[in-house]
Amino acid sequence: MIADNLQKIKQEIQDSCALVHRDPKEVTLVAVTKSVESAQAEELVRAGVMNCAENRVDKLLEKKQDLFDFPEIKWHLIGNLQRRKVKLIVNEIDYFHALDSLRLAEEIQKRLEKELSCFIEVNVSGEESKHGISPDELLPFVESLAACTKIKVVGLMTMAPKEASDEQIHKVFGTLKELRDLVQAKGYAHAPCSELSMGMSQDFQIAIEEGATFILSLIHI
């Protein structure tokens, strides 16, 4: 069943890419494993998932330990990260999807033993309930990260508003792509910013149409 559900999602990715003449290889599927146990996450890995995401530090560390026999897994931390937990996690992950303040970046820089690929979280929709910097703050924030030499800004991340129309979701994701292009055009060495992390289970088709390169999906067990 897991393999069937995974194949269904991969087919949906291919179909969405075909609509806008994109190569499916440009899109990385990240499985959100926060709602499954380690044994089920292992089934996903055995079915071909190589990117796993958690939104809690303790759960990611637990699953990484349980899946020690699969060093090829790329681990993604999504969601808000408290500064006091930075030291516990930053050297255990491959990607961080929610960089949104200089204080957090400085703490990450302080604790890192190796380079970490980070996405800057941008609150494109302007919802007060969402984390992330405002679009107006983006360029100054990117420039301020130059001193954090172990942080590599690989791209931008955003989430669509809840209960939004397809038109609204297209606008949010399209705006993030425009912001990504703006940063990329600056040619910052510390911020190549070639990636877009946007789209979850309910809206990743729209995200792909708007240029997403990383999508987060719950894969039903």
Language-model features, listed with the residues they occupy:
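Conserved alpha/beta-domain cores
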Residues: 1-202, 208-210
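Conserved small/polar residues in nucleotide/adenosyl-binding loops
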Residues: 219-221
